């Protein structure tokens, strides 16, 4: 029997426990637009009046989160950095007269506050079918090269499979490019994955969630699975939205911000079932976290700290019948945290 063990990076990922997802880009400035709706979004609309990535990262740090993921390019194709391989980027916006770089500001903020750096990239985008498969792979690998080659150490690369159904990517070439630039990086869910998607966007892992799998859920658009050919250890991640309706900011769904009780419940359904908790907040058109969302995240973090930050002193030893746990006296216990010894 082959023993399946996690890598050092995967063990670190499990210890991260809670992260933040930031959907911010051209769609932030176009109310009501949806994935793949074909609507034109002029880059001239991108002009945050007070972008402050430190505002984002300070908030999640205070809430007890340990990693953050920025959407660098969503399905619309807009690049949040001045990519040499497209004109559809921050370089052709009025923000900072075209000299701004959201990715740079995000990465610098994460490093300042000791938050692990994650970058999201959608391999597919509107109109990509007009390129030949090789042309699209060239474009994709060139942009990934910019993200992984120009911003120092990146801890996590988050690929979104949505929209990639049917395209045959050059897997070997892609993985070689990524691993050569960032040998210790964690890759989410695709091609040579180190972590896996839970299979829903509700933030919920099943009680039977296992980190040892032989196939992966690929996209919300299909029930097809990606066959891994062999069993692998892949920690699970549960992504979900602070607001019930949108990943990007909307001025019309503030009433759907989740309550502290809902967030705590999702913590139990994710971390409590052996998965990571990844909450999305869409920064607003100022380039700041919406006040209501930021306040709710801090309230949630305070509640998690209240429940878990002062464990009861104990010792334990293994016996023939299991494990004996000894406390320092009579105690009322309302939570038990169990973890596999890896």
Label the predicted regions.
Residues 1-342:
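Mature catalytic domains of secreted/periplasmic carbohydrate-active enzymes
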């Amino acid at each position: 029997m082959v023993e399946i063990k996690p890598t050092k990076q995967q063990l670190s990922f499990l210890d991260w426990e809670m992260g933040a997802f930031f959907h911010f880009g051209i769609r932030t400035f176009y109310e009501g637009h949806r994935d793949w709706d074909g609507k034109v979004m002029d880059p001239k609309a991108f002009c945050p009046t007070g972008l402050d990535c430190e505002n984002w990262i300070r908030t999640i740090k205070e809430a007890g989160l340990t990693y953050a993921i920025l959407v660098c390019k969503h399905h619309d194709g807009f690049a949040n950095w001045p990519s040499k391989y497209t004109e559809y980027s921050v370089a052709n916006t009025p923000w900072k007269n075209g000299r701004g770089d959201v990715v740079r500001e995000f990465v610098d903020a994460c490093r300042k506050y000791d938050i692990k750096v994650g970058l999201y990239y959608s391999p597919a985008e509107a109109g990509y079918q007009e390129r030949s498969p090789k042309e699209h792979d060239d474009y994709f690998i060139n942009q990934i090269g910019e993200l992984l080659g120009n911003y120092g150490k990146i801890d996590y690369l988050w690929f979104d499979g949505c929209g990639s159904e049917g395209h045959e990517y050059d897997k070997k070439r892609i993985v070689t490019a990524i691993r050569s630039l960032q040998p210790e990086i964690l890759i989410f869910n695709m091609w040579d994955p180190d972590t896996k998607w839970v299979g829903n966007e509700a933030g919920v892992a099943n009680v039977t969630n296992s980190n040892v799998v032989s196939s992966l859920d690929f996209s919300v658009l299909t029930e097809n699975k990606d066959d891994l050919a062999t069993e692998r250890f892949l920690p699970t991640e549960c992504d979900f939205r602070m607001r019930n309706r949108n990943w990007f900011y909307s001025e019309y769904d503030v009433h759907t911000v989740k309550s502290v009780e809902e967030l705590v419940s999702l913590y139990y359904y994710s971390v409590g079932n052996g998965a990571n908790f990844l909450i999305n907040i869409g920064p607003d058109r100022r380039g700041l976290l919406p006040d209501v969302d930021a306040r709710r995240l801090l309230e949630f973090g305070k509640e998690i700290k209240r429940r878990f930050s002062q464990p009861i002193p104990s010792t334990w030893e293994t016996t023939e019948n299991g494990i004996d746990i000894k406390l320092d006296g009579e105690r009322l216990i309302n939570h038990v945290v169990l973890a596999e010894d890896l």
